[in-house]
């Protein structure tokens, strides 16, 4: 008897991936190996081991990817200053390539023929998963059940599961669709699908309090960066994962990091979501303040242009591309002098700069002072203005000459 071919399934233990296990066995006659990734979603994953086996998986890998998530995905994106459409800090976007990468590594280790995922045909995640697989192991077959099977609704899923005695938590469709990791928590669906509806923050928020319920006194936080990477909070050095956890707590208590956005999905439609990113929002604000102090004008302004493209690449699932890697290399060069401490004041959802210092600061009090100085000769400005404004002057003279023609 020939050995069955293997498929690696990105497994969460939810309804979708629970029924995908028997579906793969029935339709492809594969041996199904599940892989659950811990990216800081705050759930105990060990119970999934028994559940996956009972559902029909031959084995399950439970992978702690939190450290890699921060050092290889979050921090490079933070250093780039990448924000999608001016608001979204890419929490789900850069988690998917990491999960898919680990899935590929397991597939190669197990000698699997295929990989599978539970992302729907309407969303961005299917693209992020599959582009990663194509980039890292183009020979692997990719199976996306939601684009193939006859199951069209949650009711169909429940019926399919019950017919096969698959244990599932059956609940009403009264909860938002959520995706959580160390960096953020997203909410979609229900009343949020109408962009005119104000989010019910008392009902939605899990990581933070609504700004109006935050303390009546401000909280000060100091963050130390080394070459663009955060190392300390309030003078205490933390590892990458713990540092974000600490800032999530501080930010959450002060109502920091709510993002309500109607975003353009890669697949062509707009979607509305509410994101909680307390620690990430603080880090982005602090990192920007330090860059303003340490980067020269041309580098800062050009980096802003590059940051937008970087954000698009991450959002579109193009992490493993030459362009993303090249931009990261450029960003790393810009961060050589982004070392120093930033102090922020947090107050009811607001982040206010309260000071910054660095040995690499390009700010010169001698040059910038409004008081008397012996460094800057103000007469030099006249020649500069004449040369800088010369094209404008020539344009105006030409218009004057041709007036009335």
From Swiss-Prot:
Binding residues annotated for ATP, in chain numbering: 10-18, 37, 118
Cellular localisation: Cytoplasm
Transmembrane spans: none
Aminoacyl-tRNA synthetase listed as a keyword: no
Residues at which L-citrulline binds: 88, 93, 124, 128, 177, 186, 263, 275
Claim: Methyltransferase is one of the keywords in the record: no
Keywords, ordered alphabetically: Amino-acid biosynthesis, Arginine biosynthesis, ATP-binding, Cytoplasm, Ligase, Nucleotide-binding
Catalytic reaction(s) noted: L-citrulline + L-aspartate + ATP = 2-(N(omega)-L-arginino)succinate + AMP + diphosphate + H(+)
SUPFAM superfamilies in alphabetical order: Adenine nucleotide alpha hydrolases-like, Argininosuccinate synthetase, C-terminal domain
GO CC list: cytoplasm
Positions annotated to bind L-aspartate: 120, 124-125
Pfam family, one: Arginosuc_synth
Family: Belongs to the argininosuccinate synthase family. Type 1 subfamily.
Assembly notes: Homotetramer.
Name of the protein in question: Argininosuccinate synthase
Protein species of origin: Acetivibrio thermocellus (strain ATCC 27405 / DSM 1237 / JCM 9322 / NBRC 103400 / NCIMB 10682 / NRRL B-4536 / VPI 7372)
Gene: argG
